[in-house]
Curated annotation (Swiss-Prot):
Pfam families assigned to the protein according to its UniProt record, in alphabetical order: TACO1_YebC_N, Transcrip_reg
Cystine residue pairs: none
GO molecular-function term, one example from the UniProt record: DNA binding
GO CC terms of this entry: cytosol
GO biological process assignments: regulation of DNA-templated transcription
Keywords: Cytoplasm, DNA-binding, Transcription, Transcription regulation
Official protein name in the record: Probable transcriptional regulatory protein aq_1575
Naturally occurring in which organism (per UniProt): Aquifex aeolicus (strain VF5)
Length: 249
């Protein structure tokens, strides 16, 4: 397991311990607002919004909260004006990090992200400093306990997915960005349960971390970024051998 998929497995183990419902709701509401603003308020014609609503329902968000977020995104209700921002930087060990945020105050978010990088031994860089190490992809998570690797590979090929990366916690499917929602919905028609679907950045290659101290620092930095209210995704191009991961886990 490497890169994005590696971090996904670590995050899922952490999520079992940490259920921060209020923080999750805040992130989901922002995604609904932005999806509505970019693609309109009708989920039938806006697959990103449709997916955001599904995620909110899975998290047991009350319908009135979902409806209010859609109305804010459509300009029918007053509220914060959110924009999507991408930050780039380095974690310890030369690990490249991409941070995708949704914010109503770019200066505040930039300050918070920079503080986390600095505090944990990394550094926030200029736009373009690491993005060339990643490629934009559609990203789908499937719970590993519900679908076997063999079954998923067969169905992923059938619906035109680009790549499947099996894992202990989740299997990850990558697609061409423009085909993400089509692949997701075709998988669902074949009975595959989808835990998450989003546009993301996939590492082109990975940095191997071979010492426990650096591994611990990288994971602490990524966790701290994930916990910022404005941050929606954190992607990094690292790989940690299983024996070291068990020690720092």
């Amino acid at each position: 397991m490497a890169g994005h998929s590696h971090w996904a497995q670590i995050k899922h183990k952490k999520a079992k311990v940490d259920a921060q419902r209020g923080k999750l709701f805040s992130k989901l509401i922002r995604e609904i607002i932005v999806a509505t603003r970019l693609g309109g308020p009708n989920p039938e014609f806006n697959p990103r919004l449709r997916t955001a609503i599904e995620q909110a329902k899975k998290a047991n968000m009350p319908w009135e909260n979902i409806e209010r977020a859609i109305k804010k995104g459509a300009g029918e209700l007053e509220g914060e004006q959110f924009e999507e921002v991408i930050y780039e930087g380095y974690a310890p060990g030369g690990v490249a990090v991409m941070v995708l945020a949704t914010t109503d105050n770019r200066n505040r978010t930039t300050s918070e992200v920079r503080h986390v990088f600095t505090k944990h031994g990394g550094n926030l860089g200029a736009s373009g400093c690491v993005s060339y190490l990643f490629e934009r992809k559609g990203y789908i998570e499937v719970p590993a306990k519900e679908v076997s690797e063999e079954e998923l590979l067969e169905k992923a090929i059938e619906v035109g997915a680009e790549d499947v990366q099996p894992g202990e916690e989740v299997h990850i499917i990558y697609t061409v960005p423009e085909e993400l929602y089509e692949v997701k919905e075709n998988l669902e028609k074949l009975g595959v349960p989808i835990e998450k679907a989003q546009i993301t950045w996939k590492p082109i290659s990975t940095v191997q971390i071979n010492d426990e101290e650096t591994a611990q620092k990288v994971i602490k930095l990524l966790n701290a970024l994930e916990e910022l209210d404005d941050v929606q995704q954190v992607i990094a191009n690292f790989e940690i051998p299983e024996e070291i991961l068990q020690k720092v886990g």
